């Protein structure tokens, strides 16, 4: 085994590509490394096409092995299970730029598997996996029009940073991944801390320029180690069948695309398909339905694109830069913490915001360790949203991807834990869909968060742009329909505030999209975003002043970190008793910050008072109220200050002689006591002599005591 190795510098990192030693029965295999983060990528391509196959069956799987980080998986089975959300998102990140580079009509099955086998906590494996997949596909000999490069771009101290480390990413105002060929950008995925359109475009151009070193080195690697190129030839078009279908369907399809209502248009198109299939298969039984449908789809594309390029109205009658009619309702669900329905044309999202406590945060087990996520965003796309029946179950890849994009759009305006100590979950239920449901989710989420009283920094809106390009002519479309997305050349989603962009996602199906075209699309998207924000601001101009009556109220107080163990108690007994007796939820941070969540304000105040009792220091000569916890022959033990026990000796119960303690005291009895002494072992001696229930007791120590305003803050 003589492996072939290619090594090169990529920004501040060293990239190594190796092939020929492992997985030699795969069509191609590459071990890709970047500074100790290593991803093993394999490609298997079938030489034969399945009979009746009428689509390109490309599968991309990305999997992380815990041994890569020197860890053993948790759980009962102690092995990796189904893909996590993070793994699914990275699989999509690899898939999106490579899929458009396979030729039309190529239907051979291809599977790409990327396995993380070693991880340096400072280097994210997603970029390494993308480079490895590009190299493996290029080596395999399949008709892949790559290679592609991939780059991550950060923005630190007003400078673009190529492939920042994870430490640098924490201080970066931008996390942008761009992939493309030597000639064109194909895919962008990003989140930003409210940057301008010009800064976002500059980041895309910067990343594309920098990744050329990857593309050049993969080309050299292929010259040295690549397999012979497949002699695949695109199937010859069936001209006779195309002409037959055109004669029967072209005029009718043109008329159908004058129907502006989606369902009525689809019914007409389906009727045309059924009629043409029936006529042609009756004449010739060897003609496949799939071939007829492919020709009709091509006719649809030609008609719609031709009209747009010619300057005619779009499918639903709009001009190129018109946003569909908007309708907004907030506070639509009575018992939820915040809700909104956002409708844009035939796309509608029901967004619901829920406030929770620290214990509701999601613990994410990553290769580099556990992390906590305080903002959750879930996107659901039920089949009824497009008038279909279908399976209901765990979220699909598309739902996970759309949810993450919408989350990226809103994340930049979310308050910090110090500003708003709640965990927040937003769920977007897509109730109708005809294009741009992820951007409707951004708008709906912003409205629902404001309805819930979450102090977001600004309202956020999202818009999906499209592009139709024929040779030198091109048209940028605002607020695309589902058909325009399917038949167009670009899907370009932008979310942001009035001040700038918070998220950008781009998928381009053709080469030749210049920075100038992207600039036009960004500027047109900005105009659409401002229009949507104006309508949203009329519906709800600012976050509600107060949270819902049904949301938990979080009160915070500070205690001495050394006293945390006293509040928790042995085996959690004290804190458990507090929560059970008052119906509250209590979280304590290592710095002594105590967060009490309760729907009843009085219950929260009672808990705070009791915690103050627990952490307060017992003072000699101070007088307290307490409860008798035990009666013994030589006296009684009394609990003061929320659990500290002291002894009232038999001689200190009264000035008279006491024969039996039980004659004077019983368990549970409330008494007034004075602290006589605290010895070196912190044992407390108490007396009841010369005291009665009218004697003034020390302040801020009883259950009824109020906590000072400096020690609590009600959020």
Curated annotation (Swiss-Prot):
It catalyses: RNA(n+1) + phosphate = RNA(n) + a ribonucleoside 5'-diphosphate. Its EC number is 2.7.7.8. GO terms for cellular component: cytosol. Its main location: cytoplasm. HAMAP family: PNPase (MF_01595). Belongs to the polyribonucleotide nucleotidyltransferase family. This is Polyribonucleotide nucleotidyltransferase. It comes from Actinobacillus pleuropneumoniae serotype 3 (strain JL03).
